[in-house]
Amino acid sequence: YLDLPSVFDMPKEAAEFAYKCSGKLWIEAFQVGYFEEAHDYDLVSSFPSIARNLIDIRQLEWIQSSKYQSNAVYGYCKCDVTIYDFVMVHPILTRDEQGNLIAPVGTFTEFLTKGELDFIDKWKIGEYKILEGWWGIAK
């Protein structure tokens, strides 16, 4: 059998936060002009390709903290997020009242990964306050 990590290898609350950070897949296609040939890449195969390089969560110590943990491998946080008004396009997604995924400017509360927080900081597109967070830190 395969000895793979599962959701049961992390604290239940951390797994719940991770779940709330998921389900925001952003896929778009644009065409300007005419193309004789177009390609549709196999996204289904891309997920296992990425998953094979993920860190085994059984090798992490999980801590709960509202302070950003720069040394964490994974982080899942509930945040108050502000995306600045001048930002035209960004990947920080939330759902509107009808359940549609949107990438708004302004302030909203959302569950974000450490990677999303790092993106906000790197590109200076906004700011955030971590209300609650779960962090996986290498042992």
Name the predicted role of every residue range.
Residues Y1-K139:
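Conserved acidic
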